[in-house]
Amino acid sequence: MVPEMGYLDEQFNQLEELQDESSPNFVEEVVALFLKDSPRLLSNIEQTIGKYPQDFYRLDSLVHQLKGSGSSIGAVRMKNECSVFKAHCNDRNLEGCRRSLQKMKREHATLKQKLESYFQLLRQVGPREHAVNSRK
């Protein structure tokens, strides 16, 4: 459901393939870790822009962490915007970094909402029906 909307890539599908009866909530748990950690990273990026606006090395490092975290669940739009931010760091373009941060925050909020809706729907459908439908 969510992958077709362009928010997630094949990595999300691969995570779903790892989920089985022994770990029926695997994907939701991995996504929950991302949703728990990513707001902290976004906040750290925002604070660094405010306190150390010319420390592009630190900004790049923080965004690299966010990009890796997003990539682990297949958050393609987050990953792409992180790449844009990193390019702004490379160009030492603070305004570009600020604009990109706002886009990352919007993408994160949208992704969070879509993932929460997706997992809520899966809980309503139930694990057996999901397993049967996901193998088609």
Predicted region positions:
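Two-component system phosphorelay core
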Residues: M1-K136
